[in-house]
Amino acid sequence: MSSSFFCFFLFCFQTCLIQNVYSQCLGRVGPGGPPLGPYGGPLGGPGYGPVGYGGCGGYGGSGIGNVAVAGELPVAGSAAVLGQVPVIGAVEFAGPACAVGSVSISGACGPTCGCGGSPYY
């Protein structure tokens, strides 16, 4: 393999990784604005642009996962998670816990994700 082919392959691979990392649950909405509407994706309307489907929409994938934690968890400090995570499911906490602090769980599934719900707190 030549060096230029390897560099091109590496560039394409990194581009795919960056697309997956920085994409959001956008549905068919692309990055286009008023001057870029035909080239990105439609922002409002039925979801189809004049040149076909919006080709630059976010990934918006879905998955099923279970997380189980057992044992003693000595945790101190605070954690903050910001951003949009397309998750539909339930949160459950069971068992005895000696804890001080507060927990806030809030979420929303906006109309771009397909279910059109409003935030709940």
Swiss-Prot record:
For this UniProt record, the keywords arranged alphabetically read as follows:
Repeat, Signal
Extract the GO molecular function terms from the UniProt entry: structural constituent of egg chorion
Q: What GO biological process terms does the UniProt entry carry, in alphabetical order?
A: chorion-containing eggshell formation
Key word Zinc present in the record?
A: no
Got a GO cellular component term for this one?
Answer: egg chorion
**Family note:** Belongs to the chorion protein family.
Query: Mind telling me what this protein is named?
Result: Chorion class CA protein ERA.4
Lineage runs: Eukaryota, Metazoa, Ecdysozoa, Arthropoda, Hexapoda
UniProt lists the gene as ERA.4
